[in-house]
Amino acid sequence: DVAEKWIAAMPATRLSVLLDEGGPVFCYSVSPQNAEWLKLPLDLQIRHMDAVSSLHTIVAANSDFAENPAQVFAAPLEYARSRGFEAAGTPWGTVLLVEVASVAQIKPYVEVWVPIK
């Protein structure tokens, strides 16, 4: 199965989320170099993300992140607007699962990029 090969290639591949025009979409991301090196099957829906100027931050996601992934883009988009920037592409992020020792649970954080102009 194609998805199993992408999952097996972690951490070179990453669970990601992008804020598409139709709403948030969970996906996997990989650099072109790693995709070639790992010979990952690319017969999926592929979106190439060009290198552009972006706002970059890490956001702590709420407990309902799996059901409401768009939440992680709200504050970075508002911050960009408040500084006079406009969105210039598809915001996206990679999901980081962090163990929080004080509460002994895994918490999702998302490293977010918001293309700006």
Name each model-derived stretch.
Residues 1-117:
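A solvent-exposed interaction/effector surface
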